[in-house]
């Protein structure tokens, strides 16, 4: 048994395996200088400074900045920027990469053209040095020579990339093909472009390969093979996240798309460890869309508590990895509170099954101690077949919530509990079993519009919550959901004012009040 302590020493699933000083970190560094756009073919949001740093390094950008004021014709600068533009447009376009991989002659013509431009720059440097042999002329020639050498290095690296990519694709196809169908190993431009970002629209690097396994059983082998190939593994479901968790930060990354893992079980009464009575639950694969689970629960007369705004597109695996909530979280908590069991693959390529004991069928912070049984199974076998080890994890219930805040999205460690709220950093969620609930018989929805200063209306949220929490303790009405909409959101959705005032509200609160006593619900609504 272990209790919550420091984080275990495990590799990070979606962190770059090799540090690249001119890679993603340099690309996303704050750019305080003017965003000059002299590099041609740059249709991206990267500035010239960011591109030069990625391709040539910080020193080269400093030299270019110093030489900018000494230009006469600017022809050498234009040729250098053309070289960088050609390299950049290929690196940022998987379709061009595939075309050049398939056409060695065309690729060689491009590389020769890049070398020709650099040779012309060197000729102009020597001519300028012959004409201006003074100290400023020699310094200028020295800077140009340094830039030419750096650019030749970039061209050589660019030329080598194609052979390296082709070789890595051959190795990856062979290794990954042992774990899944070859049709599920995608190197094509469409797949890579489709997985370069999530709902953030933040683009850093294109992934090397996209994997679309057919079954849960294939995941463990794929993760193990990816790490043996030196690839960073990035789990991805519906791609609806707003934290950038599915955004590749290294070109040597493998995105594992779990959308085919769409097994959805029937609602059934299940015996949970430490619970005296059977509990309604539902099993779902990581790729099941949240809406499908919600509808399956409703069809059986139950409620699925996890209802993020993205429920029509988000997937179950992402709900676990993000500890998703929604409006019903007020009543039953977030994903963590409603999980009875989940399975994942850890960075070692082994199965990890987490089972909650003594489930209170409510918010986890309401109990003194939450207990989780962790079981690791050999990834070379079917899930649950060959046990490696097990342990019991005990965590104080209050540890999962921050006082005065509730869910703390900055707490990724979450007391050492695997999978939940980790955004895929400690493993890939493959399936889960959820506790379902019964909605009280009567429901009323209240819409409150506020027309004064927004800051004066904010305390009403706390007052409503406190009032209804107090009534629920006395067996009365319960607050099932409370949603706050600010003026900007209201205007974006074209909100129609409900009151007779000739003004647009600064804030709207929408609350669901529920209970088994119709009179109590009506009284709370009037209050």
Q: In which residue ranges do the predicted regions lie?
A:
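Glycine-rich, acidic/polar active-site loops that bind/position phosphate-bearing ligands
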Residues: 341, 431, 444-465, 469, ...
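N-terminal flexible segment immediately upstream of the FAD-binding catalytic core
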Residues: 2-224, 241-280, 309, 435-436, ...
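Flexible, glycine/charged-enriched surface loops at secondary-structure junctions
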Residues: 180-189, 304-309, 392, 399-407, ...
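FAD-binding subdomain of flavoenzyme oxidoreductases
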Residues: 263-274, 280-464
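Generic non-transmembrane alpha-helical segments
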Residues: 171-182, 221-231, 296, 460-471, ...
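Glycine-rich, histidine-containing beta strand-loop boundary motifs that form or position
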Residues: 235-239, 246, 258, 286, ...
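Residue-level detector of anion-binding/catalytic polar loops
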Residues: 231-232, 303
């Amino acid at each position: 048994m272990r209790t919550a302590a420091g984080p275990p020493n495990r590799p990070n699933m979606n962190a770059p395996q090799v540090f690249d000083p001119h890679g993603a970190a340099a690309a996303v560094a704050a750019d305080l200088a003017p965003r000059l756009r002299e590099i041609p073919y740059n249709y991206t949001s990267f500035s010239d400074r960011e591109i030069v740093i990625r391709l040539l390094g910080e020193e080269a950008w400093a030299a270019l900045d110093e030489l900018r004021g000494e230009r006469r014709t600017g022809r050498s600068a234009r040729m250098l920027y053309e070289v960088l533009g050609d390299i950049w447009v290929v690196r940022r376009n998987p379709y061009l990469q595939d075309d050049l991989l398939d056409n060695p002659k065309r690729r060689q013509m491009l590389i020769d053209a890049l070398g020709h431009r650099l040779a012309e720059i060197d000729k102009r440097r020597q001519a300028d040095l012959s004409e201006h042999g003074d100290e400023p002329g020699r310094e200028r020639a020295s800077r140009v020579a340094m830039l030419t050498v750096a650019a030749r290095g970039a061209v050589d690296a660019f030329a080598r990339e194609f052979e390296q990519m082709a070789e890595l694709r051959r190795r990856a196809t062979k290794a990954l093909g042992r774990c899944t169908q070859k049709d599920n190993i995608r190197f094509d431009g469409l797949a890579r472009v489709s997985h370069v970002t999530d709902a953030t629209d933040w683009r850093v690097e294109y992934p090397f390969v996209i994997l679309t396994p057919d079954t849960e059983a294939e995941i463990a082998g794929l993760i193990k093979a990816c790490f043996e190939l030196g690839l960073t593994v990035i789990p991805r479901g519906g791609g609806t996240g707003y934290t950038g968790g599915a955004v590749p930060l290294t070109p040597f990354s493998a995105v594992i798309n779990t959308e085919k893992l769409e097994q959805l079980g029937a609602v059934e009464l299940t015996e949970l460890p430490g619970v005296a009575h059977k509990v309604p639950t539902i099993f779902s694969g990581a790729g099941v869309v949240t809406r499908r689970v919600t509808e399956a629960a409703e069809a059986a007369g139950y409620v699925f508590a996890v209802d993020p705004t993205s429920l029509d597109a988000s997937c179950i695996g992402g709900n676990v990895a993000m500890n998703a909530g929604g409006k019903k979280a007020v009543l039953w908590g977030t994903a963590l509170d409603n999980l009875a069991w989940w399975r994942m693959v850890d960075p070692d390529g082994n199965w990890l099954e987490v089972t909650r004991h003594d489930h209170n069928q409510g918010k986890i912070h309401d109990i003194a101690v939450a207990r989780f049984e962790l079981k690791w199974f050999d990834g070379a076998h079917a899930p649950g077949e060959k046990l490696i080890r097990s342990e019991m994890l005990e965590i104080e219930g209050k540890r999962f919530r921050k006082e005065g805040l509730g869910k703390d999205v900055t707490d990724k460690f979450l007391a050492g509990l695997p999978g939940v709220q980790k955004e895929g950093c400690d493993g890939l969620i493959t399936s889960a079993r959820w506790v379902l609930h019964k909605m009280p018989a009567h429901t009323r929805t209240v819409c409150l519009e506020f027309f004064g200063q927004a800051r004066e209306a904010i305390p009403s949220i706390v007052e409503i919550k406190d009032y209804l929490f107090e009534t629920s303790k006395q067996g009365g009405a319960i607050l099932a959901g409370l949603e706050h909409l600010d003026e900007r959101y209201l205007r974006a959705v074209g909100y129609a004012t409900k009151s007779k005032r000739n003004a647009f509200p600064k804030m709207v609160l929408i609350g669901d009040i529920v209970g088994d006593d119709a009179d109590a619900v009506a009284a709370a609504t009037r209050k």
